Structures are given as structure tokens and as C-alpha cells.
Amino acid sequence: VKVNLNETVSPAVVVVKGNGRVSVDGAGTISGEASVNKGGEGTLALNTLNSYTGPTVLHEGILEFNSLTNGSEPSAIGASANFAQSWIFDGGTYLYTGGTTSTDRAAQVKSETELNIAKGDATVTMNGVFEGDGDLAFSGDGQVTIGTNKFFGYKGATILRGGKLNLSTTDISKAGIGSSSKLVMVGGELKTKGESNGYETYS
């Protein structure tokens, strides 16, 4: 199903379930105080620049998005404030299909959820705090750079399935991987910043 937005819409809530693919495209935008909720095994692709201020919640399946900005700035996943409850990881895969960017958005990791950076030439720098009890997995062909030693606030494991995970400073490397300090490497590459100017790489 392809939804073409040619104007601004302000629903109370957006809920997408099922096993198919729903793609939201066009020059319009999702605005207002709406929340976007994704369940079911299918895919929801958000390809519009949205300004809704409610939370984005993924329970199951794939939520595909092509832009990511700081909190309160419009993006494919809205313009919610920089609070953990505004971006919920409760299962499934967040699939980022855009280019290099950075964000200070915080998130709540409730259960194992994957963040996939699709493009090999894309780097996403995370400057927010992720908290919660769930596991967080990284995958794809691109790179996630951790820009703050407060990012790993969640209690679950960090799982690297693909792509690159870059701990960009010595302080971040020393802070550990999640409050459980449990790292599971299934694939991909881990880069850590040492006391010298270089990086240690593990794969």
C-alpha cells in the first residue's frame, strides 16, 4: 500500500499492523500531537518530513525511515522532544535508509530491537541517551558512531550483527557497552578509541 501525502494531516494517532508494506510518500507531512505505532510483521516506510510531536513506537516488523534529526526538529520519525519516551524500541527493526547524520534523540529500549543503517557510506552519530531493560542490536552496511558516554544507559546487551559500531572517544570506550557491559558480536566491526591517537578494531 502506498500513501501519497500532498498536504499536512494531523491525526490523533497512526497505527500500522499486518504483514504487508505501507509506504508514506509525497510533499505532505504528518503533524500535530500524533503518535506513530508499528506492529505486525510487515513494513512501515516513512519517507515524508514529519513534524508530529508524539512518540514513535515500534513493537514488531520494520519501521523504515529516510531522515533523522535532533529532537524537536522535523524528520521522518517526527519532531518529538528529546525524551526517552518519545522514541520506543520494543521489538522489530528500525531501518534507516538516509545518509550521514547526527541526532541527540534519546530512546527507551524495552525489548530487543535492531537499528539497521542500510547505506554503506552513511554514518549516524548518536548523541542521546538510550535507556531501558532491553537488548539493542546494530546491523546493516553503515556505521553508528557513539558521540557521548551516556548513550549506553540501557541494561540489556549490545549486539553487533553488521556494519560498524564506533566508540569515538577514550571516555566512551572506558564507559563500557551498556550498563550490563555485555557485548555479543555476531558480525560487523567494533572500533574503540584508545589512549593513543589510533583506534582498536575488532571483528
Where would I find each of the regions flagged by the language model?
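Beta-strand repeat architectures
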Residues: 1-45, 53-124, 129-145, 153-203
